[in-house]
């Protein structure tokens, strides 16, 4: 979605006005009758999904409308329900491309934006069409949260802020997303004031790593450094509070280590169950590389053998981005004695090469080293 936003808004001739769509209670209000009548799937299974309800505190709550709260199938059903929005806009405004209306839709599940050449056109023509489309499905746009914004003022979408600065489009983590992330970390640290350092690191790392990976395709390096500083301040207060009678120097040496050029790494050594000493180190968001996302082709199907070569190429490029991926490719290279599996010539950094699966993923293969070759 971020790559699509960049594609439709980054050029000088791109639309300057954006309709930010917000569906009021999307998952709660989708019409069961509409889904049963229109979704192309087994109706018996669909009815069971819709009527499954949910269990909270050992009590069953039936689902009379919408999709089951928290169910893994709910986003899929919502996505299928909204799947015709782009087609509807293309039919309703079939001449938009030739008349300079600059109509584009970017949608991810129930979050979407629609671009246009003017605020009035989006308000008076596009918005009513969207309202009509949603009404058929039992949905309505939120009057308060649905708004039309100029790209120069920017807008928030999926946790990012999209805005043009002097004609240059930048996509950054939004202030609201950063604040929510720090609030979550702060609450976790405050709830574990007496927890062992290794345990706290184990609780924080998945959150830090997941958030940083989510924003690793946008302009986020400066934000990553700011988040690292904020997390350091939280952990410093956590450490000082635990030892009110110790000096600050003692606290620093107890909880923060020197690693390379970094002198304040939240880290510790602990003995694991097998008797071996293991080092636990807090993840730094700033260590996450910023890599531009390569959009997948719309028609690509990972289950179709005809697309195997395309997905092999994408997979190989992703492997080169991470240290774990490069290490796996290195093990494959060593397994083959540093030579190509086909021509047996040496594979070096100066020779063109690519990786592939011996048993294709579409045929049940895995990403294990034993199933890879260069």
Question: What label would you give each PLM region?
Answer:
Residues 344-374:
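Histidine-centered nuclease catalytic patch
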Residues 228-320:
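Extended C-terminal regions of large enzymes
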Residues 51, 60, 136-202, 206-211:
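A conserved non-catalytic segment of reverse transcriptases
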Residues 299-342, 366, 370:
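Short, charged surface segments at domain edges that flank catalytic/cofactor-binding sites
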Residues 104-108, 144-154, 203-207, 224-232, ...:
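A glycine-rich phosphate-binding loop feature that marks nucleotide/adenosyl-phosphate handling sites
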Residues 1-154, 338:
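Conserved polymerase palm-domain catalytic core
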Residues 188-249:
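Right-hand nucleic-acid polymerase module
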Residues 20-21, 63-71, 109-115, 189-190, ...:
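Glycine- and acidic
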């Amino acid at each position: 979605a971020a790559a699509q936003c960049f594609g439709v808004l980054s050029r000088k001739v791109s639309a300057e006005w954006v309709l930010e769509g917000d569906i009021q209670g999307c998952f709660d209000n989708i019409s069961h009758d509409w889904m049963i009548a229109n979704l192309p799937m087994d109706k018996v299974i669909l009815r069971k999904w819709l009527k499954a309800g949910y269990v909270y505190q050992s009590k069953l709550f039936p689902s009379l409308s919408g999709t089951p709260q928290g169910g893994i199938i709910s986003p899929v059903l919502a996505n299928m329900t909204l799947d015709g929005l782009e087609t509807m806009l293309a039919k309703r405004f079939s001449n938009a491309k030739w008349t300079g209306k600059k109509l584009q839709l970017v949608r991810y599940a129930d979050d979407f934006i629609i671009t246009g050449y003017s605020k009035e056109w989006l308000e008076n023509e596009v918005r009513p069409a969207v309202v009509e489309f949603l009404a058929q499905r039992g949905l309505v746009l939120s009057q308060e949260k649905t708004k039309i914004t100029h790209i120069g003022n920017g807008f928030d979408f999926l946790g990012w802020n999209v805005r043009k600065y002097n004609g240059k489009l930048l996509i950054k983590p939004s202030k609201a997303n950063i604040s929510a992330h720090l609030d979550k970390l702060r609450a976790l640290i405050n709830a574990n004031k007496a927890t062992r350092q290794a345990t706290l690191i184990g609780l924080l790392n998945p959150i830090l790593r997941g958030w940083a990976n989510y924003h690793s395709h946008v302009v986020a390096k400066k934000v990553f450094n700011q988040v690292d500083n904020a997390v350091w301040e939280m952990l410093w207060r956590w450490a000082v509070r635990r030892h009110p009678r110790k000096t600050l120097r003692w606290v620093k040496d107890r909880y923060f280590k020197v690693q390379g050029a970094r002198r304040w790494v939240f880290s510790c050594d602990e003995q694991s169950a097998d008797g071996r000493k293991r080092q636990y180190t807090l993840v730094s968001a700033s260590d996450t590389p910023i890599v531009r996302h390569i959009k997948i082709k719309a028609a690509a199907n990972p289950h179709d053998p005809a697309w195997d070569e395309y997905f092999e190429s994408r997979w190989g490029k992703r492997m080169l981005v991470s240290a774990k991926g490069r290490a796996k490719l290195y093990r494959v290279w060593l397994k083959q004695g540093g030579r190509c599996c086909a021509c047996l010539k040496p594979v070096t950094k100066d020779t063109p090469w690519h990786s592939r699966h011996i048993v294709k993923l579409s045929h049940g293969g895995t990403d294990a080293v034993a199933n890879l070759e260069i």
